[in-house]
């Protein structure tokens, strides 16, 4: 889905020790500075406990930011890239055996580094 929107895949499920995981690391070419896009993928079958976006708490955001810092240390070629944190959210994920594929909601700049 994201590649069809113009992003380029770089990595998925990138782990750093016990610090955390980055679901997707994508690249977005821009006119000025290229952008490294960190994408958190969330799924919820039902919204009775909140939406997928609601599940990305401030603590989860801090963990993603810290893991991104480790990623940048491991990949210095991205030092001069802009960084953006996006969320790809799937609501109402079908049960096994259902043919319906949910349409993702892509939230650019879902959160920022404070």
Descriptions of predicted regions:
Residues 74-114:
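Domain-level recognition of nuclease-like catalytic cores that cleave nucleotide substrates
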Residues 44-70:
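Mg2+/Mn2+-dependent nuclease catalytic core
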Residues 15, 27-29, 90-92:
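A generic structural motif
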Residues 2, 64, 85:
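Residue-level signal for inorganic ion chemistry
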Residues 17-20:
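Short acidic/glycine-enriched loop/turn segments that link adjacent beta-strands
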